[in-house]
């Protein structure tokens, strides 16, 4: 039996039309903020990535394979940030800040489930070169504008700063290597409180320390309330993080941006603010996320370059939008008009009409199977053509076309065809 691997999908025309529409809107928002596109290979050398993403990603989630001709090892693109870091290191002449967007497929060897696939599309916008909160505020605003443009209502963007947790861990809990703890906390939404406690125990944390960690990340309240509590801690990381976050909240000034101490994000390269976007329903995981990674580019160039970015998860955006009724699959074809040849001898006249319509920008199809008039019409309805145009002996003789849609029928001269077709499409 013919099939495709688990976690991979085919997309029929209605789904691809929706995806293209979503991508077009996201790309429009990226351009509105002054981001420019780049493209990078789907493959990277394994040596380029190894040791930089974290144990779970590298040991479990990446597709890694050898090239039997060169004996090199490659990895499929796990996400779009590493290719950007490698690109910037290879192009030091790039003026800063470098504002780039990148839309492309990525691959992860995860267990497929709702909202989680092994091949999926990411849309990233990053600002390279600015260490300031203005840059973080801008990528967060891109995130919020994207959600608003698709009419998502019950969404929130959770924001935290890794430096804040690191400083608190150092001063209050005596923890100097927080990264294993971050990876455990990052699983909170997947495995729950008890699961995180179990992960922390496996890391060797004693019961009282686990309790204090869970109490810390469970702190709730406005940013100002929590900030006032933590400003009493004498730690430079805490102070820098709180000042940075305060500016972001001041610039973005949106009630959907909320402070959440439990948010850490799992990748090791984050160095400052991190954020994730989710909807209350359906519970499908984060629809977008990002953060600051000021040391990643330096791993390739030998010199740290500040950077921050956002990644929009198109698959989950669409899955959530379909479930909420924000999106639908009603548009089944790009075809504006399908031309039916009433008789075989009228086909060349149909071809002439198709040339006129295509030159004016209308998506036009006509019969290529030498089928009967009724079979042509049935096919046009099946593919979802918006308007059917009939051409027969009388139309060819009088230089006319008969347009037909669900609500309208009209015979028009060729000179009137374009305006009449626009009228039909406006009500179809």
Swiss-Prot record:
Annotated compartments? Cytoplasm
Q: Which GO terms describe its molecular function?
A: ATP binding; histidine-tRNA ligase activity; RNA binding
GO BP terms: namely: histidyl-tRNA aminoacylation
- Give the EC number(s) listed in the UniProt record: 6.1.1.21
Per the record, what are the reactions this protein catalyses?
Answer: tRNA(His) + L-histidine + ATP = L-histidyl-tRNA(His) + AMP + diphosphate + H(+)
Kindly report, in one word, the top-level EC class recorded for this enzyme.
ligase
Query: Carries keyword Acyltransferase?
Result: no
Write out the entry's keywords from A to Z: Aminoacyl-tRNA synthetase, ATP-binding, Cytoplasm, Ligase, Nucleotide-binding, Protein biosynthesis
Per the UniProt entry, the signal peptide is none
Which is a Gene Ontology cellular component entry for this protein?
Answer: cytosol
In Swiss-Prot or TrEMBL terms, this protein is called Histidine--tRNA ligase
Family from the record: Belongs to the class-II aminoacyl-tRNA synthetase family.
Report the InterPro entries cross-referenced here: aa-tRNA-synth_II (IPR006195), aa-tRNA-synth_II/BPL/LPL (IPR045864), Anticodon-bd (IPR004154), Anticodon-bd_dom_sf (IPR036621), His-tRNA-ligase (IPR015807), HisRS-like_core (IPR041715), HisRS/HisZ (IPR004516)
Pfam families (UniProt xref): HGTP_anticodon (PF03129), tRNA-synt_His (PF13393)
